[in-house]
Amino acid sequence: MIEHFNGIIYLIIFVIHFLIYAVYAYRCIVTTKYFLDKYGVDHSAAIMTRFFGSMFLGSIIMAIYIIFIRPMIHGDIGLENPWAFFNLIFLQNLSAFIVAFYSIKISKLGINDKTSIDGVIVPGILTLLSAILCYGLADKM
């Protein structure tokens, strides 16, 4: 498995990236009330928050498929052909970062005392991690 990721570093980055996704999926889908209360959002936004979390969940399921299930079904083919998935993840992270930056620094719509800079920092970290994955795995995809 390690050789398919061009070494342990890229495998660790992959795992960290999707663990962060798992945390946010859990917080949005399972502990929705706590998540909404933390950011001062009305509980009527629960459905949209869970919708947001479901996007993370779908990506996690695909990542699990790529790393564990796909090799069992198709043999030891490594990371051949999942480039679209990794690029989509990068573009989603980049979009989240840009929109969050715009929302907090430029638009300021809905900014209050419970507004957290987490909305910019986490997508920024995820964008960096996914960019590193796209670069480091480019020859494998």
Locate predicted features.
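Juxtamembrane helix-loop boundaries in multi-pass membrane proteins
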Residues: 41-56, 82-89, 112-126
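Membrane-water interface of transmembrane alpha-helices
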Residues: 20-33, 97-104
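Hydrophobic alpha-helical membrane segments
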Residues: 85-104, 123-130
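Hydrophobic transmembrane alpha-helical segments in integral membrane proteins
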Residues: 1-21
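Membrane-helix boundary connector in multi-pass membrane proteins
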Residues: 98-119, 139-140
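Core segments of alpha-helical transmembrane spans in multipass integral membrane proteins
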Residues: 19-25, 46-71, 91-94
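Juxtamembrane boundary at the C-terminal end of a transmembrane helix
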Residues: 130-141
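Cytosolic, membrane-interface loops and tails of multi-pass inner-membrane proteins
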Residues: 28-45
